[in-house]
């Protein structure tokens, strides 16, 4: 996830990615570059296409390569979803939130980026990793238990679900829902 975002931002090759994920990360890079909706094993979009067309730079972001890279990276971090109901994806979010929570200087950088956006554009539609980090801290959860114990993970998932139910405003009618209902993003779009 982060290797793809970093490569999109810098224009450099992917940083080392574990062998099990290398091909998947390379495929994500190709999909983003093509900017055509397609299936994504990485995001679990195997029955419906993921909207890679969102990654096509537009407006002033087309002025130069640097702005195009910035646009694609920001879209990646804003739209690349983790599904609350998918254990693998949810555990990855929990790990991200724990790392963020354990590093106050990184949490401050994250807040310094997100707070002006929230002020100017409003609160996010999906749950943010920051909110998951706050719940981890308040609930005094042990990361190892969340990674290995399904009952603990399910209890925590219910707490995140409360946020999702109150906050997520953009949802398709359940009859037409093609992807997961509740998504978590590093930097959710508004």
Residue ranges and their predicted role:
Residues 1-190:
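Long, non-catalytic protein-protein interaction scaffolds
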